[in-house]
């Protein structure tokens, strides 16, 4: 069996056990292991697992019982990380798409050859598939040599990777390191192999930082080896650098990096580069190492030859990009997610880089400049209403470093607070630079190792019972299964729900994890920052304006609603009352908003008429291929309620519309319209207290006529 065979990695796979044992015997002689490898396989490590039973009861269990407990813990972790069956099915569909069948597999086979048994690809479900080893290895009466399968000519299977940066692991205790190692092991079992860069920080001399990086890399490697069916390697001499020309380091050998990853090893790297002229070890910033790895794994590191045919260059780069898919860039930092100073939540749940990067960077820069001023004035005065209203003070006091009492602490807190904001700036910038080099499907996660480790802790229930409190969702596994953040970015703080700590006390759910996408540009017509959307705005935008691609807009609506639009009738209805248009990306999602008047109120442009106008969401559409993932709906909804109509908007939906649950969670109120099939939603504060406005909202939602071309009798 070739050591490059990509079997699914599970505890119950007997073939994997044979493969692993053969791999261990050849590790020291295999051609893919250069001298620079420092493998923990040479160390005697007790294979163990961290699950809910005590060590004594675990030792009394037999081998099969131990395997069942390990699988039980693994699958419980997965089930707790996926919110719905739809998310689990979506992950399985994406996983299946990663391993497409070759055209020859669909052809009938005239004769099956006796070959080595194959295992199903994708998420392995223990021994649910296939026969046992005794069946595979039973003797067969056959005279003459056994037939062999023809050599495979299929290309190398694409390797799906997560690039992880673990910051200052020397400050983390063993429980946190073990929790991180367990999560990395589970990601590996789910088909996402991890390459980890250990970041020792910047405090200390270069020689000390190099030693710390090596020690912490070995520490993490040992923790990963302790996980069931897990392998790790500390790989040295990965980076090279030209000392005469400052810049990013380069990956010395792509093959030496990818080979152990293809074997299922979690590869651990230190940010140490070696000069090209005279070999000398130089500590480089971990972020530079991450960007160098991203560039290499994205197939962009090769320098094009000016004499080479451009088509040949493009083909060569394309082959490199087909070898590897860098799906996730994960930044594990004790600071956690990117803080949100201008919003009610403590951190940004989701960042659409194309739209929000500049604003969030400026927000952090302004917060950094505010820290020294707040430090000298607020600490001496003690707690005050000013401090309570200052978003920077609230963040640094509650999230970064609690401020002790006493005058001796006044000068000691400014530096940590400023350093924390600079750390967030670095995390934001490295995520943006990395995602710029990757496909739009790739994403980034910025979270703390504490959150990852706490969600990886075993269930407190007995190993003999599956009944217990739902465990905290692991942000990394949840994101792999759903391609979404733990919490929706468009969900109001009041709707993010409580959580119980098991002792009767209920706490609000807050996320310190930031999900990052390269994302898509967002277009708002007219721009609400220069032309606010008000009833008095004249002249109004029209959908047949040259700045709007009407055919693509119509396709977006028809694809989302799965109905044919009567375009001319729709234009006649909305053109004279259009408030604005929101478009996400290349018409992947959008919203059409209008100013509507209740029946009987004349639109004469008077102040009384404008006061009765209702902000109305006429169409909210997302392409089918973008529904449920990518955050398109959240991007459009956030733009609507935060930028375009911050004072409120209303809309209607069929009472049996499956999207209503999503609407319920994001609206401030709902009202079922009697004698109709409609439910009215609104985000306007205190609407029910204004009886006239409420009646106007209801009248608009009752009277608006649809403009569908297919008269099926089904409303909207």
Curated annotation (Swiss-Prot):
<dbReference type="GO" id="GO:0004042">
    <property type="term" value="F:L-glutamate N-acetyltransferase activity"/>
</dbReference>
<dbReference type="InterPro" id="IPR006855">
    <property type="entry name" value="Vertebrate-like_GNAT_dom"/>
</dbReference>
<keyword id="KW-0496">Mitochondrion</keyword>
<feature type="compositionally biased region" description="Basic and acidic residues">
    <location>
        <begin position="102"/>
        <end position="112"/>
    </location>
</feature>
<dbReference type="Pfam" id="PF04768">
    <property type="entry name" value="NAT"/>
</dbReference>
<dbReference type="GO" id="GO:0006592">
    <property type="term" value="P:ornithine biosynthetic process"/>
</dbReference>
<keyword id="KW-0012">Acyltransferase</keyword>
<comment type="pathway">
    <text>Amino-acid biosynthesis; L-arginine biosynthesis; N(2)-acetyl-L-ornithine from L-glutamate: step 1/4.</text>
</comment>
<feature type="domain" description="N-acetyltransferase">
    <location>
        <begin position="537"/>
        <end position="706"/>
    </location>
</feature>
<protein>
    <recommendedName>
        <fullName>Amino-acid acetyltransferase, mitochondrial</fullName>
        <ecNumber>2.3.1.1</ecNumber>
    </recommendedName>
</protein>
<feature type="compositionally biased region" description="Polar residues">
    <location>
        <begin position="497"/>
        <end position="508"/>
    </location>
</feature>
<dbReference type="GO" id="GO:0005759">
    <property type="term" value="C:mitochondrial matrix"/>
</dbReference>
<dbReference type="InterPro" id="IPR011190">
    <property type="entry name" value="GlcNAc_Synth_fun"/>
</dbReference>
<keyword id="KW-0028">Amino-acid biosynthesis</keyword>
<dbReference type="GO" id="GO:0006526">
    <property type="term" value="P:L-arginine biosynthetic process"/>
</dbReference>
<keyword id="KW-0808">Transferase</keyword>
<keyword id="KW-0809">Transit peptide</keyword>
<feature type="transit peptide" description="Mitochondrion">
    <location>
        <begin position="1"/>
        <end position="44"/>
    </location>
</feature>
<comment type="function">
    <text>N-acetylglutamate synthase involved in arginine biosynthesis.</text>
</comment>
<feature type="region of interest" description="Disordered">
    <location>
        <begin position="487"/>
        <end position="508"/>
    </location>
</feature>
<comment type="similarity">
    <text>Belongs to the acetyltransferase family.</text>
</comment>
<feature type="region of interest" description="Disordered">
    <location>
        <begin position="99"/>
        <end position="119"/>
    </location>
</feature>
